[in-house]
């Protein structure tokens, strides 16, 4: 039986990720200038997990109001801890527990981050998402979207070591594998192993089956009358709010 993915990631994820590797972690290469978020308006971090992207957003825009949206309670607890212990962002960062479809948001926001989230939204949910964002973004404000769509591998991705880190006497290892799961989904299995002095003392295994989406499908769903689409680089697209046409 698989363990809860969010609970396991809350325990192991940042231990394996921190400190940030500037050469490999996407946080170090967010294309802020080309995205051109509007920093004198509220900025949204959608599905921000434990808050590493929220900290990056707040650091890039040191005067902006930040809205951090994270429905999962375990990940949100890590997010809130990160915000709470930093007085320079605590007063201007609001942590919101609902999904992006249901959450309160202020009018006239200046942009949003959407990293590694879109493939967890079904087709009708994506339609509602774009409609919601059209209501809250000002003209010119972008949704900076990572080009990660949960693609189904053509063949089995064999289990392999995807990361390791140490803390005290423990070494933490993450093993990754994936395969097509049918009905447009991919099965992703992560196995976490804890070693003490070389001896295995704990394991956890998670299985998720996100939608596998082609970029062409995602982009075709974006309402062109409301947004323009800008290819920034191989990792990011800016979906930018356009002025409503007046008749």
Which sequence ranges carry the predicted segments?
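Class I SAM-dependent methyltransferase SAM/SAH-binding core
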Residues: 57-102
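Glycine-rich SAM-binding Motif I of class I
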Residues: 51-55
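A short SAM/SAH-binding and catalytic strip from SAM-dependent methyltransferases
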Residues: 110-125
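SAM-dependent methyltransferase
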Residues: 146-213
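A short glycine-rich, Lys/Arg-flanked "PGG" loop and its adjoining helix->strand segment in the class I
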Residues: 127-139
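C-terminal lobe and adjacent flexible extensions of AdoMet/dcAdoMet transferase-like proteins
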Residues: 209-247
């Amino acid at each position: 039986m698989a363990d809860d993915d969010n609970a396991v990631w809350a325990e192991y994820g940042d231990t394996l990720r921190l400190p940030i590797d500037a050469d490999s972690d996407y946080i170090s290469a967010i294309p802020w200038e080309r995205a051109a978020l509007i920093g004198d308006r509220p900025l949204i971090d959608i599905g921000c997990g434990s808050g590493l992207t929220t900290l990056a957003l707040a650091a890039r825009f040191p005067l902006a109001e930040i809205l951090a949206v994270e429905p999962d309670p375990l990940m949100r607890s890590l997010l809130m801890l990160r915000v709470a212990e930093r007085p320079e962002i605590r007063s201007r960062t609001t942590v919101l527990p609902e999904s992006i479809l249901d959450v309160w948001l202020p009018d006239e926001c200046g942009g949003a981050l959407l990293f590694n989230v879109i493939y967890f939204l079904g087709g009708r949910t994506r339609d509602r998402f774009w409609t919601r964002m059209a209501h809250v973004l000002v003209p010119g404000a972008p949704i900076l979207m990572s080009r990660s769509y949960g693609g189904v591998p053509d063949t089995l991705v064999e289990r392999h070591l995807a990361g390791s880190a140490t803390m005290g006497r423990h070494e933490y290892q993450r093993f990754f594998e994936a395969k097509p799961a049918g009905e447009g989904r991919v099965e992703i299995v992560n196995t976490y192993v804890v070693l003490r002095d070389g001896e295995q003392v704990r394991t956890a295994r998670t299985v998720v089956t996100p939608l596998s989406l082609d970029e062409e499908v995602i982009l075709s769903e974006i309402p062109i009358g409301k947004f323009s689409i800008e290819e920034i680089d191989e990792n990011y697209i800016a979906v930018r709010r356009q002025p409503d046409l007046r008749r």
